[in-house]
Amino acid sequence: MNTIQHTDGLIAALFTPLHPDGSVHYELLPALVEHLTSTGISGIFICGSNGEGPNLTLEERMQVSEAVIRAGKGRLRMIVHVGHASIAEARKLARHAQEAGADAISSVAAFYFKPTSVQNLADCMTEIAAGAPGLPFYYYHIPSLTGFSMDVLDFMRIAEKQIPNFAGVKYTAATLWEYQECLHYEGGKYDVLYGFDENHLPALSMGAKGAIGSTFNFAAPFYLKVREYFEAGEIEKAREQMLFCVEMVRIVVQYPPIPAQKAVMKMLGFDMGPCRLPLVALPDGQYQELHRQLRKIGFFEKLNE
């Protein structure tokens, strides 16, 4: 691509709301988009890990993408995750995302039959990206879920040569040293988005501008404050605010992360429903304990300040 757009802000990894029977609650999506817009979010990552993309059917993923894009196009940057265990199905999702008006696409590595090398991964991503040649393509690096890890910088060196629409990486791993290398590769040519919310301040110190995160759905104002303090050179205030974010994340991840975060959304007035098996919603006892712990650190009070 001739010009790569560099993200400066927070992109929320959107949850997919479900009805009690497990069907997708499409009607709630516009309200979620409005909520995120009001919190200062810059974009939405659709049908990723947080959105239970791998647990949705192809048709459901397409309909979710259409509904979210329709609700927020022109106001928020729309990145559709198209990763799938089948490269052919991922390519279909990529083509659909382009037709639906997405601003970019992203894909994880195949997670059943895994790539055998960096070159093999690049070949897979080349096939997927070709499904939407008019959209920027981001490789989604999340080894904790795909079970596949390799040198991301080596991947970028290959991808820039054989993927015409390669734009960058969604880097969701705690290896900040490698993230820094990727971020500054070729003078910072590519848009490398950081995906570990609890490392947001360290990532900023390395030069990060854009980030994609799950807790941005309900805690964006806290992270935006971190950024504000950091950019103003008020490092102690940034550290203090970031420590609160870390404390919040620590509470949430005591429980299965996606069900727990859906529970937090319910506490804020957005009933996201259950999760798709094998994920399950928090039992009432855990829901109440999560609420108690968040209340104890002043989460709800601070959010309303």
Kindly give the residue locations of the regions a language model identified.
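Structured C-terminal cap/extension of enzyme domains
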Residues: 38, 201-305
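A general structural signal for well-ordered alpha-helical segments in protein cores
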Residues: 29, 61, 65, 90, ...
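Short beta->alpha linker loops
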Residues: 82-85, 173-174, 195-198, 218, ...
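Active-site beta->alpha loop and helix N-cap motifs at the rims of alpha/beta catalytic domains
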Residues: 2-148, 304
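Short catalytic-loop micro-motif centered on adjacent basic/acidic residues
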Residues: 78-81, 167-171, 212-213
